[in-house]
A protein has these predicted regions:
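Helix-start (N-cap) detector for alpha-helical repeat units in TPR-like alpha-solenoids
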Residues: 20-21, 54-55, 88-89, 122-123, ...
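Structural signature of tandem alpha-helical TPR/SEL1-like repeats
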Residues: 1-11, 32-45, 52-55, 66-79, ...
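Terminal, low-structured helical/coil segments at or just beyond the last alpha-helical repeat
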Residues: 168, 176-217
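Canonical tetratricopeptide repeat
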Residues: 25, 32, 59, 93, ...
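Short acidic/polar micro-motifs centered on Gly/Asp/Asn
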Residues: 13, 95-99, 163-167
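Short solvent-exposed coil/turn linkers within tandem alpha-helical repeat scaffolds
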Residues: 16, 118-121, 155, 185-192
């Protein structure tokens, strides 16, 4: 599909070098084909024609991220946000880019600001919590996941995050409880196998008959 669309958009550009829709469509096609360098090259030509559209700069940033160059992505994601401060996805991607260049403090600042100004934007909670887990800060990660499920009790990934955080904190009863909550919501997901196996491991290791601890369901 996208290979065919590349030819269509190239023909459109040949007929009109100022046709922004054709450049954008070509760039998006290249992106889905994972030809990120071609996508970036096309988008850079596009912003020379029209530098007022935040989506164009956003896509450049995303392509740089996908191509393994978060340091280059930052500049274009910032430009997208300056054009449109309501572009929440650009802010998320900017936070990811900062994390990837070892600027965790800036990444956390962006997530915190997003949560403060857009409390219903659940992706900010999840990404922040996942980042905190990656940093080994499991207590703060669990707190952030709890904020998320307070907003949306059906956000199943948050229950898995809480379970894994408690697991790392050696709060095994709580870990089992939240693994089970996750399984109630998503018993057939890819992570369900891990969750079931981990519950069984924890029960056998810490809550067996030989152990003085008991598990309360």
């Amino acid at each position: 599909m996208y290979k065919e669309s590349v030819q269509t958009y190239l023909q459109a550009i040949m007929m009109d070098r100022a046709e922004t829709k054709a450049y954008y469509g070509l760039a998006v096609s290249y992106k889905y084909l994972k030809e990120y360098k071609k996508a970036i090259s096309t988008l850079l030509k596009l912003v020379k024609i029209d530098d007022s559209n935040d989506s164009f700069f956003f896509e450049i940033g995303v392509c740089y991220l996908s191509d393994g160059h978060p340091e280059k992505a930052i500049e274009y994601l910032i430009k997208a946000i300056l054009i449109n401060r309501e572009n929440l996805e650009a802010q998320i991607q900017l936070a990811i880019a900062h994390e990837l260049v070892d600027e965790a403090d800036l990444s956390l600042m962006i997530y915190n600001k997003l949560i403060e100004t857009n409390p219903e934007f659940l992706k900010a909670y999840y990404n922040k919590a996942a980042m905190l887990m990656g940093m080994g800060n499991f207590l703060e990660a669990s707190k952030t996941f709890f904020q998320l499920i307070k907003r949306n009790p059906d956000y199943y990934k948050a229950y898995l995050g809480i379970a894994m955080s408690f697991d790392k904190l050696a709060k095994y009863k709580d870990a089992i409880r939240y693994y089970k909550k996750f399984l109630e919501l998503k018993q057939f997901s890819e992570d369900a196998v891990f969750a079931r196996e981990r519950v069984e491991e924890l029960r056998n290791q810490y809550f067996s008959r030989e152990n003085t601890l008991t598990l309360v369901d």
